[in-house]
């Protein structure tokens, strides 16, 4: 998603710096829009215009490019057969997350979803994970969080959750943090977890 924001801003001659990239890590889409609108008042439409443009890109991305990670369907099938509760805790807007899951016939695997709209705070704080565990009736130690954002892996681990880090090129700079905070790591495919859970 960082690349989407960078690509959108580039069309206005704005090149996102490493400092700006780090500052926005863990922000919701509205927070990112406000951050860049404040820094670049010349952006057409301010924060609402940026939100609208980014929203179009995100919608297109979910509809045409985003796909499930290799092996995830078989993995989810296995968890469901074992009666393991599953939920989603995401900073993605609910409408985008639900549409992506529905379009890929994946909604039925999950008991519920919590989003940034439900908790109002980034994954630098453990609220979204703690509320998800509470809603499932489980202690953090009895849950496993699957995350690709290194800072979010660290947050979940510090809150007492078991963590499975998912290596993603977009977070290459933080891969050592992801590995340090993770009990398990998915390099490329969920098939790698066979016999580990």
Language-model features: where?
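Hydrophobic beta-strand core positions in alpha/beta domains
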Residues: 87-88, 165
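Residues at secondary-structure transition points
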Residues: 23-27, 45, 49, 63-70, ...
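Generic anion/oxyanion-binding catalytic loop in active/binding sites
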Residues: 10, 21-22, 61-64, 86, ...
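Residue-level detector of anion-binding/catalytic polar loops
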Residues: 15, 85, 162
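Asp-based, Mg2+/Mn2+-dependent phosphohydrolase catalytic module
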Residues: 77-80, 93-197
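N-terminal helical cap/lid subdomain that shapes the substrate entry/recognition surface
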Residues: 1-73, 77-82, 95
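N-terminal start-of-chain detector that recognizes signal peptides
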Residues: 5-6, 57-60, 85-87, 116-118, ...
